[in-house]
Amino acid sequence: MATADELDRREREILRALVQDYIHTGEPVASQPLLSRHELEWSPATVRSVMADLEALGFLEKPHASSGRIPTERGYRLYVDTMLKVRPPSPADRDRIERLAQAAPDVSSLIEGTADLLHSLSHHAGVVTTPRPQADPVRQLEFVRLRENRVLVVFVSAAGIVTNKLVQLEFTMEPAELERAAAYLNEKLHARAEAAEPELAALRAAILGDMRADQSALHDLLQKALVLAEQSFAAAGVEKVVMEGESSFLDAPEFSDVQKARALLRGFAEKDRILRVLDRVLTAQEVQIFIGAESEFATVPDVSVVAAPYGRGDRVLGTLAVVGPTRMNYARVIPLVDLTARQISRALAALSEGG
């Protein structure tokens, strides 16, 4: 197989023009329309010959009996890596991104708003992962008694994410006991704020240490606090995916086939698969583009992911992405994802300082 460096100027120019046309029209591109839309200096016969060569090299393919050709995943990859000229987001797009980052009252609203905004700006699916538990530990707990042995646990993470979990206990805790347990556990959490070990391991060690110290007046409360902590943290610490606009794929001609569309939507429903894809971006310093099979997003072809990490300071918390057809407008989507990740990171820092 030829590499990008082995293509001559004529082959590169024709491939670039064809990919751009296919992204714009969604229709297989023939030589004559290509010549009419671009100022190519070669004859129709030459263009047809070069297109045939590019097909033989694996950069183009000819669907069915069509007279035109479309890019393969290899063709898209070459285009994105070596030919693409990204353009900065428009002032209107930039303003919408900045307004979201400045106006979000809390981290949860920021995450949800980001997924919706990415969908709105790109017209593809917007996807955002909530901060990872490893990077965003629990910093405060609150217990609310609902019934004798049912407790609502309110978690507040270091980034300000608030989540609720219902815990069923095998014993009864009075509201005053729950308040004392929360105060005790929060004191231990704050003391371990910079520790590398998970919250539950730190809490368990601290509680057992206090119990061994024979603080008899607190012994019963500490036993209950230990059980409460174990059950609470067993229900917490799950990275989540927020998505908006999955159905936008159904507007693309590539997904007009019902079986293919169903397979794609099943892929969106498999949150673990999505997390595996997006977690590959956590160690990156910039936008990452996964084209087609590279993404492992779903069991169907023609899906690409443009993703970037976001964080607070030098700590990466999660990932945001646009998921769309391989025929997406990369020149527009890549800078949108990049700017959004940077603005959301700044907003997280501001929310953290404000909290």
From Swiss-Prot:
Disulfide cross-links: none
Domain of life: Bacteria
Keyword annotations: Repressor, Stress response, Transcription, Transcription regulation
Any Pfam family hit: HrcA_DNA-bdg
Homology family: Belongs to the HrcA family.
Function in brief: Negative regulator of class I heat shock genes (grpE-dnaK-dnaJ and groELS operons). Prevents heat-shock induction of these operons.
Name of the featured protein: Heat-inducible transcription repressor HrcA
Lineage: Bacteria, Pseudomonadati, Myxococcota, Myxococcia, Myxococcales
